[in-house]
Amino acid sequence: MVAISFLEAEIERHGNQEAYLLRELRSGGEAGFDEKKLLQGFFGYFERLKPRLVSFNGRGFDLPVLKYRAMVHGVSVSWLYGAGDNWNSSQSRYSTDWHCDLLDVLSDYVASARVSLHEVSAVLDLPGKFGISGSQVAELVDEGRIEDVRHYCETDLLTT
């Protein structure tokens, strides 16, 4: 793992509607940080702020990978399991207050076909991918192009 990117937004509520004001978009740490340091920074940030996590397939891929890698390095994520209650927590699939996985929401929690972030972007006339796909990340890392990977992650995040 060479990059963990995040977007911080302020939620403005207007009745039943929410609007999001972008505050910050970046990759955590620095390009030279090792995996353990990246994970400590990411999970420490979330433990302090307890923000709503918004992802695209984050519940099925990103968050499990982050948790497994945290286990390898002895980075505690216990707070993830204690926040909220049984029905409204970061582990509750159907509550979007702590974690809104857009893939789950758009597919009616896999009751209908799953679509890619690229397909959703095309339908909404959003730019989507900018010249790099996920299949190229390992090659970029091997070539030492960590900044390119960080920018790719940030672009994916902005699209989400």
Show the residue positions of the predicted features.
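Metal-dependent phosphoesterase core characteristic of DEDDh/y 3'-5' exonuclease domains
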Residues: V2-E12, Q17-G28, R48-H151, T155-T159
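Short, basic/hydrophobic alpha-helical segments
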Residues: E35-L49
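Short, flexible loop segments at the rims of nucleotide/cofactor-binding pockets, characterized by
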Residues: G28-D34
